[in-house]
């Protein structure tokens, strides 16, 4: 009947708007990360947003890694992201800044093995995700920084140029899904 089909159309319009809203919020958080201070003004940050089927793919990989690595908390985190509208991914390329500071444990950037992260790259990643998490809180969107999601993203080679990936899952529920985790 006419009213039933118009009701379904209304629900579909609302869902599309919710999808638009979660993508818009994710993009705002990515902007906060992109504009966060970085050592020497060098931007080695790689940003992406996962939704829908990509979240499912990441969660499945997390569950697989939970078994392979004997890390049960990966299952809990996988369930968390399955209840999120979007997951913002923050990756960092290893790119020494040539400061020869020794903060990575090696006397010079030249002595540092290629696969060892530059201290400043890791620090920049933390500052960027902190800026994004702060904005999420300002917007009253629940979030939690998760390295576990990043491990699955790396294992799936979703951000091949990155050596480090962290994630900020986003949820808008009546109660934070990240609060009473067991």
Description of each model-found segment:
Residues 1-182:
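Acidic, surface-exposed loops and disordered segments
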């Amino acid at each position: 009947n006419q009213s039933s089909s118009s009701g379904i159309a209304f629900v579909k319009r609302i869902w599309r708007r919710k999808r638009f809203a979660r993508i818009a919020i994710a993009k705002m958080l990515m902007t906060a990360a992109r504009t966060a201070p970085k050592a020497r003004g060098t931007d080695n940050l790689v940003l992406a947003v996962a939704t829908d089927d990509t979240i499912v793919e990441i969660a499945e990989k997390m569950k697989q890694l939970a078994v392979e690595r004997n890390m049960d908390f990966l299952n809990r985190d996988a369930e968390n992201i399955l209840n999120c509208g979007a997951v913002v991914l923050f990756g960092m390329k290893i790119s020494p800044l040539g400061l020869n500071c020794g903060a990575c444990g090696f006397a010079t950037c030249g002595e540092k093995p290629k696969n060892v992260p530059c201290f400043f790259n890791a620090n920049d990643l933390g500052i960027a995700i902190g800026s994004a998490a702060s904005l999420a809180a300002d917007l009253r969107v629940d979030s939690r920084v998760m390295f576990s999601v990043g491990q699955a993203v790396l294992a799936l080679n979703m951000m091949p140029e990155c050596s480090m990936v962290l994630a900020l899952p986003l949820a808008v529920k009546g109660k934070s899904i990240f609060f009473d985790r067991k």
